[in-house]
């Protein structure tokens, strides 16, 4: 038996959820519309109702957390459940629901880490010519919504503004498989990320000026980018350009308060290739700069990495949303082509499994952005086609995936990175935005017909790690 590795005292072992992916009740109890409602209905592939029925079943899930040693839970507030029209009239039933949820969490010792916008900006901001966060008035609306939540839900001490701004930009304007989406519009992708980062910055300043107490940060899907051939200058440049899209643009905004010259140069070049311009104003930079001292924490969602090689040609991206292994393609003009390095495994959805990439990413944040304060791994997990036999789910590949990533987190901590917690994605099986219900991530299996929960083998494994603070490598 190898020697166990010890997590620091106070390390959070959490599970992650998101409102639209777990709550169900998407058009009831006073909730307003979000773009996904009509988009998914038109596709007809799968419905977000009832998802995990968390709106009604959350006491069951919080009890499972308590029984399995999980002491933190990522949840999000559905903006349109509070403000059905984005602004104006408040839905008191939605406010009461979240108070009850947070009270249940806190009473059970399962501390809530709450995100304000997790891919479900209200539909109202896309009407009458609106384009969501591409329309600057949405920035101000978000800040007002955030201020309401800070003042109303004072029982919450851990806040995140947004979940995965790069993923939002990718789904909306690169892959184009999200509502109101367009393909290969890098100009709009960068602009969307910029506007959302300005909204984040203004909300962070409002939080600290309001003296609400606790901490606030942002969650980003950060993804290491590697040249397929590290000795090939063109491959290195392809990796650098991909890194600007996914990582540097949002990290610079968060921890520099502006965009480094080479970051801006790369973004401008890609925007021009897409036929557009960027609108980065002096007052935007002032807002980013004002938030610099107040970014208390960074949430890192991490699943995979990307290997890039230089290539010329036209855009060609195919998203694997079915689990048909080998069906994904990623070729972006001005960047290059994504590929798989020989010997590196992938999931059925073509996500590259490379846990060492998380270590590289964490050390990179520490070295390139030394003013960061703390990091939470806010999502990490493996989508898997779980088998179900007599109530037992043997998900050994998921355990191995988690074990490897946790080991690299410990190595990063040993290297001086301040990582305060880990939230497995996901707490329970959930609705997936582009995969529906066949791509399962949960520690707890859900029979979606009966809504009964079953602990998987990974839940028992994670319970042991959480309760002992020890990882057997």
Language-model segments: residues:
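Active-site region of glycoside hydrolase catalytic domains
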Residues: 2-42, 85-87, 95-473
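Active-site-adjacent substrate/metal-binding segments within catalytic domains
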Residues: 23-98
